[in-house]
Regions:
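Basic nucleic-acid-binding interfaces
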Residues: 1-125
Length: 125
Protein backbone atom coordinates (compact mmCIF):
# COMPACT_ATOMS: atom_id res chain seq x y z
CA UNK A 1 0.00 0.00 0.00
CA UNK A 2 1.22 3.46 -0.84
CA UNK A 3 0.33 6.87 0.53
CA UNK A 4 1.47 10.31 -0.53
CA UNK A 5 1.92 12.95 2.17
CA UNK A 6 0.88 16.55 1.54
CA UNK A 7 1.19 19.83 3.42
CA UNK A 8 -1.61 22.18 2.39
CA UNK A 9 -2.29 25.80 3.26
CA UNK A 10 -5.33 27.86 2.36
CA UNK A 11 -6.83 31.08 3.66
CA UNK A 12 -10.12 32.76 4.41
CA UNK A 13 -11.37 35.06 1.66
CA UNK A 14 -9.96 38.58 2.13
CA UNK A 15 -7.86 37.13 5.01
CA UNK A 16 -10.71 37.89 7.41
CA UNK A 17 -9.90 36.66 10.91
CA UNK A 18 -13.07 34.64 11.45
CA UNK A 19 -11.61 31.32 12.64
CA UNK A 20 -12.50 31.76 16.31
CA UNK A 21 -12.12 28.83 18.77
CA UNK A 22 -15.75 27.66 18.38
CA UNK A 23 -15.45 27.67 14.58
CA UNK A 24 -12.02 26.04 14.73
CA UNK A 25 -13.35 23.21 16.89
CA UNK A 26 -16.24 22.52 14.50
CA UNK A 27 -13.89 22.80 11.51
CA UNK A 28 -11.55 20.23 13.07
CA UNK A 29 -14.45 17.77 13.41
CA UNK A 30 -15.62 18.43 9.85
CA UNK A 31 -12.18 17.88 8.35
CA UNK A 32 -11.76 14.56 10.16
CA UNK A 33 -15.21 13.41 8.99
CA UNK A 34 -14.50 14.43 5.38
CA UNK A 35 -11.20 12.55 5.45
CA UNK A 36 -12.86 9.43 6.79
CA UNK A 37 -15.67 9.62 4.21
CA UNK A 38 -13.34 10.27 1.25
CA UNK A 39 -10.51 7.87 2.12
CA UNK A 40 -7.56 9.96 3.29
CA UNK A 41 -5.95 10.64 6.67
CA UNK A 42 -5.49 13.98 8.40
CA UNK A 43 -2.39 13.90 10.61
CA UNK A 44 -2.40 17.55 11.63
CA UNK A 45 -4.89 20.37 11.21
CA UNK A 46 -4.32 23.89 12.54
CA UNK A 47 -6.09 27.21 12.19
CA UNK A 48 -3.39 29.88 12.21
CA UNK A 49 -3.83 33.54 13.11
CA UNK A 50 -7.60 33.21 12.65
CA UNK A 51 -7.37 33.51 8.88
CA UNK A 52 -5.66 30.47 7.36
CA UNK A 53 -5.34 26.70 7.63
CA UNK A 54 -2.39 24.31 7.70
CA UNK A 55 -3.26 20.69 7.02
CA UNK A 56 -0.99 17.63 6.79
CA UNK A 57 -2.64 14.65 5.09
CA UNK A 58 -1.80 11.25 3.62
CA UNK A 59 -3.73 9.88 0.69
CA UNK A 60 -3.55 6.93 -1.69
CA UNK A 61 -2.29 7.80 -5.19
CA UNK A 62 -5.76 7.24 -6.68
CA UNK A 63 -6.99 10.32 -4.78
CA UNK A 64 -5.65 13.51 -6.36
CA UNK A 65 -4.61 16.50 -4.31
CA UNK A 66 -7.04 18.68 -6.27
CA UNK A 67 -9.90 16.37 -5.24
CA UNK A 68 -8.80 16.49 -1.59
CA UNK A 69 -8.63 20.30 -1.61
CA UNK A 70 -12.01 20.49 -3.36
CA UNK A 71 -13.57 18.26 -0.69
CA UNK A 72 -12.00 20.14 2.20
CA UNK A 73 -12.65 23.68 1.02
CA UNK A 74 -16.04 23.01 -0.58
CA UNK A 75 -17.67 20.97 2.16
CA UNK A 76 -16.25 22.99 5.06
CA UNK A 77 -17.25 26.28 3.44
CA UNK A 78 -20.84 25.17 2.94
CA UNK A 79 -21.17 23.62 6.43
CA UNK A 80 -19.57 26.59 8.22
CA UNK A 81 -21.98 29.02 6.55
CA UNK A 82 -24.88 26.79 7.62
CA UNK A 83 -23.73 26.50 11.23
CA UNK A 84 -22.36 30.05 11.67
CA UNK A 85 -24.46 32.29 9.37
CA UNK A 86 -23.09 35.43 11.05
CA UNK A 87 -19.73 34.98 9.30
CA UNK A 88 -21.43 35.92 6.02
CA UNK A 89 -21.47 39.51 7.31
CA UNK A 90 -17.68 39.62 7.03
CA UNK A 91 -17.59 37.88 3.65
CA UNK A 92 -19.62 38.37 0.52
CA UNK A 93 -20.36 36.47 -2.68
CA UNK A 94 -20.98 33.33 -0.60
CA UNK A 95 -17.32 32.29 -0.52
CA UNK A 96 -15.48 31.41 2.65
CA UNK A 97 -12.09 30.42 1.23
CA UNK A 98 -9.74 32.09 -1.23
CA UNK A 99 -9.60 30.28 -4.57
CA UNK A 100 -5.87 29.66 -4.33
CA UNK A 101 -4.01 27.28 -2.05
CA UNK A 102 -0.48 26.07 -1.44
CA UNK A 103 0.46 22.39 -1.49
CA UNK A 104 3.71 20.46 -1.31
CA UNK A 105 4.50 16.79 -1.05
CA UNK A 106 6.27 15.73 2.11
CA UNK A 107 8.66 12.83 2.35
CA UNK A 108 11.65 11.55 4.22
CA UNK A 109 14.01 11.55 1.23
CA UNK A 110 15.80 14.77 0.37
CA UNK A 111 16.43 16.08 -3.12
CA UNK A 112 20.15 15.42 -2.63
CA UNK A 113 19.49 11.76 -1.79
CA UNK A 114 17.36 11.34 -4.90
CA UNK A 115 20.01 13.05 -7.02
CA UNK A 116 22.73 10.73 -5.67
CA UNK A 117 20.55 7.67 -6.22
CA UNK A 118 19.81 8.60 -9.85
CA UNK A 119 23.44 9.45 -10.56
CA UNK A 120 24.53 6.15 -9.02
CA UNK A 121 22.03 4.23 -11.15
CA UNK A 122 23.39 5.66 -14.39
CA UNK A 123 26.94 4.61 -13.42
CA UNK A 124 25.88 1.05 -12.58
CA UNK A 125 25.34 0.06 -16.21
Amino acid sequence: MCNINYHMVWSVKYRRKILKPEIEEYLQELVQQIAEDKGFTVHLFECSEGDHIHCFVSAPPKLSITAIVKYLKGITGRKLFERFPEIRNQLWKGELWNHSYYVETVGSVSEENIRRYIEHQSKSY
